[in-house]
Amino acid sequence: MSRPSSRRAFLKHSLVAGAATWTAASWSRVYGANSRLKIASVGTGGKGWSDLTATAASPQVEVTALCDIDESKNFLGQAAEKYPQAQRFTDWRRLFEHKKAFDAVIVSTPDHMHAPISLPAMQLGKHVQCQKPLTHTVFEARQMRLAAKKYNVVTQMGNQIQSHEAYRTAVKLVHDGTIGKVKEVHSWQSGPVGWRLVDDRPAGSQPIPETLHWDDWLGVAPTRPYLPKIYHSFNWRNWRDFSNGQLGDFGCHILDPVFMALKLTAPLTIKAEAPAMNNDVWTKWATVAYEFPGTELTAGKTIKVTWYDGDDRYPAREGLGLPESYKLPASGSVLIGELGQVGNSPCGDAQTFSPENFAEFKIPIVPYARSLASRGPTLAAVKTRRRLLSTTPDH
């Protein structure tokens, strides 16, 4: 197990010093016609497993390195069994010492370790697919953007839903002026996905399993005792030290098409309502009202986008203009336009509402947009450095 002081000092230095502390690999290297992209995966369980297996399904890819702080069956164990030819590591820093062993990195760790791993990878000239949310803080996101541009690497944030037909169809409906200028937007996530909300940090500790490198799991976060099923492997999303809460977990999926559809930039004002919070956990619910500068697609000089999260929390139906027969999905958005509404959700198809305007309207279907968000860094993208969906500089 790594020494906490040396590890955190190293990570702090690499994050703050940024691009100045590493030397990028040269782009003079040219991949041959039959070359395969060598992939290293940091984080091999949960979402890391699906990212890894989806990427490895491409004949253009060879999995050459696996890294996870958990050596048990459901993490590094299963990955090593499926890809026995790959080198194995429990410390990403040791992996990065073998920089000739891989061309690109998949980073599928808890949120707080996204930037501390992705930044050094880019500084080594490695292409990076990093899971959403891109970083734990705004400062880290800005550093990631600078590094991606400086080292001219292919990057992607792993918000796979951005590629789905429903999302891109909803964007097209707005861009085509189908519902007129948009007046307001309501977006929601009615409870966490796959993890349970808690009130406070439990007391006590338990022995650390031999297969778990707990100190390396904590990474840049403050030290805390190990408790099974409280942090690792999935419930870390409750904790401010490790995640960005419900808004960070699913806002990147649900608000993404809103930003794309309306071409939004930075908000002018943000007003949040939530129960009292402490230094450990995220609140169980929140309502966040954003006011953005208007665009050519909005009805006014500004537009209000309201976010709702928490168990069974939805926008009030009054004022949405939706038919009574329409049941709000567990997560999604309603964009209210001058001529009607567009409903969009990761749970289903894009829809339009306003019987008098859309009685015979047929919704166009935008084909599924395959990208690095769905299949990992492709050899063609690495060769040409072509622009992909959801790049690190974009986010």
Labelled PLM ranges:
Residues T211, D215-G300:
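Rossmann-like dinucleotide-binding domain that binds NAD(P)(H)
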Residues A54, T64-C67, E71-E81, F250, ...:
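Glycine-enriched catalytic-core subsegment of oxygenase/oxidase enzymes
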Residues R36, H114, V182-E184, W214, ...:
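Extracellular structured ligand-interaction cores
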Residues S58, A147-V153, D176-G180, L262-A266, ...:
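Secondary-structure transition/capping motifs at alpha-helix termini
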Residues H127-Q129, T135-T211, D216:
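A contiguous active-site-proximal alpha/beta segment in oxidoreductase catalytic domains
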Residues K38-V42, V63-C67, I106-V107, Q129-C130, ...:
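Structural recognition of the beta-strand scaffold that forms the well-ordered cores
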Residues M1-C130, R142-V154:
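N-terminal glycine-/serine-/threonine-rich beta1-alpha1-beta2 phosphate-ribose binding loop
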Residues A115, L119, R142, H164-R168, ...:
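A structural signal for well-ordered alpha-helical segments within the folded catalytic domains
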